[in-house]
From Swiss-Prot:
Similarity-based family: Belongs to the RbfA family.
Intrachain S-S bonds: none
Protein source organism: Gluconobacter oxydans (strain 621H)
Protein name stated in the entry: Ribosome-binding factor A
Lineage of the organism: Bacteria, Pseudomonadati, Pseudomonadota, Alphaproteobacteria, Acetobacterales
Compositional bias annotation for Basic and acidic residues: 1-10
Function: One of several proteins that assist in the late maturation steps of the functional core of the 30S ribosomal subunit. Associates with free 30S ribosomal subunits (but not with 30S subunits that are part of 70S ribosomes or polysomes). Required for efficient processing of 16S rRNA. May interact with the 5'-terminal helix region of 16S rRNA.
This protein's record includes keyword Manganese: no
GO biological process terms, semicolon-separated: maturation of SSU-rRNA
Entries under HAMAP family matching the protein: RbfA (MF_00003)
Gene label: rbfA
Location(s) in or outside the cell: Cytoplasm
Region (Disordered): 1-22
Pfam families: RBFA (PF02033)
GO molecular function: ribosomal small subunit binding
Length: 142
């Protein structure tokens, strides 16, 4: 038998092959909650972020807790990609807010990614409602 336990199995980029740990999930949810509060109550000086409603849908934390990837969407619009440079500019400010709100040894560096899950679901719904698919669904098998 190998000297490595089953908990030592690593996948690509050092990520555990068994998924995130319970602590990673817990910290990620706390980071998501604090980021959502900061976006809801903070007036950003960046002109690209004025009067913009941003929703943080998910946060993933790296195994070493040094990096957090926040998946964001823009309320009512799907063009969140244009906001990514502005979000990158305010990331240090948001990290400071995280450090004040969370009791962590290392406050993660925040990286932003657009959350396309809602767009994908809407596109799939549109496809499912198309006449061609409805015809195929309603046809009787031979």
């Amino acid at each position: 038998m190998s000297s490595r336990s089953r908990h030592d199995v690593k996948g690509p980029a050092g990520v555990s092959a068994h998924g995130p740990s319970t602590r990673q999930l817990r910290v990620a949810e706390e980071v998501r909650r604090v980021l959502a509060e900061l976006f809801a109550r903070t007036e950003f000086r960046d002109p690209e972020l004025l009067d913009v409603r941003i929703t943080v849908t998910e946060v993933r934390i790296s195994p070493d807790f040094r990096h957090a990837t926040a998946f964001v969407t823009r309320l009512g619009r799907s063009d969140v990609e244009v906001l990514l440079p502005a979000l990158k500019r305010v990331a240090p400010f948001l990290r400071t807010g995280l450090s004040k709100a969370l009791n962590l040894r290392t406050v993660p560096e925040i990286h932003f990614q657009p959350d396309t899950a809602l767009d994908n679901a809407m596109e799939l719904d549109e496809i499912m409602r198309s006449p061609e698919v409805q015809r195929d669904l309603n046809s009787k098998p031979e």
